[in-house]
Amino acid sequence: MSSSEQLDDGFTGLKVIAKTEIAQGIFRFELAHPQGMLLPAFTAGAHLRVRVPNGSIRNYSLSNDPQERERYVIAVKRDANGRGGSVSMADDIEAGDLLPVATPQNEFELIENARQFIFVAGGIGITPILSMMRHLKASTDLPFKLYYCTRNPELTAFRDELLGAEFANTVVIHHDFGNRADAYDFWPVFDKPSSGTHVYCCGPRPLMDSVLDMTGHWPPGSIHFESFGVDQSRFAENRPFSVTLGRSGIDLEIPVDRSILEVLRDNGIRAPSSCESGTCGSCRTRLIEGDVEHRDMVLREDEQHDQIMICVSRARNDVLVLDL
């Protein structure tokens, strides 16, 4: 890669000053400006948009304290069954390389008027949560509790830090060892809503679904979700359909293995996006016509008749007409 840090398309090359395997198949990357300059500020819960060596664009959450302006820290789980971005990061990037990144964005910010926080993380979903915890410890006196679910100790990212003195009495780490019957029982946590408490959950879709199911009686707006990537294999019955763009009249075909958002990009049509898992709301689009299978975790029931999250949701019938 070129030694110049300024790249095209809004990306800047940051130097990888350290790469460390912090758990089995999970790598931490520390990034800094090549000339030692301060980096653009970010807030807890933010993510970096990264152009990985194979050319893909991926989002990775920042895990360090936002007060640290001299570096960004991300963690990547190598997933051989994923879309290739994590494998390219794990296998092709080494300390000393330049990695193209865009300015941090945040669709998962902490609520300013909260009295306390409950954090739920699964697997690599710990990354934005850890940034939030570090921020709260360094800058506030607000109480919080983390429930972190992983398969086993070897797959637990940041385990030593979480069990250290800094977070004493604020962290519960649970291992299910691959047995669903041994999953953590969250009902005692969410049985009784607490005024001013906000819940932040990041992890695999089954974990988020479980938290969503158990918090239906909580006040609206008090439960927040974030996830990067979506497992389309859980929708084995995907069927192709068509999308008509209402403003231009363009017709697009959506195959079983591509999302509306991906097909728009393939055709040079820009649409806002961030998480690409139906949890942040960035790709909310007005629906003009059609019957939608809503797969997001954002839209309320009263919004589903005229809106769609184009990163995950699909058509129940043959054609959707969108206000694009």
Curated annotation (Swiss-Prot):
A single Gene Ontology MF term assigned here is: monooxygenase activity
Q: Which cofactors is this protein said to need?
A: FMN
Residue ranges of the 2Fe-2S ferredoxin-type domain? 241-324
Where is NAD(+) annotated to bind?
115-229
Q: Kindly give the InterPro entries that the UniProt entry links to this protein.
A: 2Fe-2S_ferredoxin-like_sf, 2Fe-2S_ferredoxin-type, 2Fe2S_fd_BS, Beta-grasp_dom_sf, Cbr1-like_FAD-bd_dom, FAD-bd_FR_type, FNR_nucleotide-bd, MRET
UniProt domain FAD-binding FR-type: residue ranges: 9-111
Induction per UniProt is:
Induced by phthalate and repressed by glucose.
Q: In which pathway does it act?
A: Xenobiotic degradation; phthalate degradation; 3,4-dihydroxybenzoate from phthalate: step 1/3
Q: Give the binding site residues for [2Fe-2S] cluster.
A: 275, 280, 283, 311
Q: Which residues form the signal peptide?
A: none
Sequence similarity: Belongs to the PDR/VanB family.
Tell me the name of the encoding gene.
Answer: pht2
- PANTHER family per the record? CARNITINE MONOOXYGENASE REDUCTASE SUBUNIT, NADH OXIDOREDUCTASE HCR
User: What is the recorded name of this protein?
Assistant: Phthalate 4,5-dioxygenase oxygenase reductase subunit
Q: Name one GO biological process term.
A: phthalate catabolic process
Assembly and binders: This dioxygenase system consists of two proteins: phthalate oxygenase and phthalate oxygenase reductase.
Under the heading Gene3D superfamilies, the entry gives: 3.10.20.30, Nucleotide-binding domain of ferredoxin-NADP reductase (FNR) module, Translation factors
Reaction catalysis annotation? phthalate + NADH + O2 + H(+) = cis-4,5-dihydroxycyclohexa-2,6-diene-1,2-dicarboxylate + NAD(+)
The catalytic activity of this protein is classed by the Enzyme Commission as: 1.14.12.7
**Pfam families, alphabetically?**
FAD_binding_6, Fer2, NAD_binding_1
Going by the entry's taxonomy, the superkingdom of the source organism is recorded as Bacteria
Q: Which UniProt keywords apply?
A: 2Fe-2S, Aromatic hydrocarbons catabolism, Electron transport, Flavoprotein, FMN, Iron, Iron-sulfur, Metal-binding, Monooxygenase, NAD, Oxidoreductase, Plasmid, Transport
- Species of origin: Pseudomonas putida
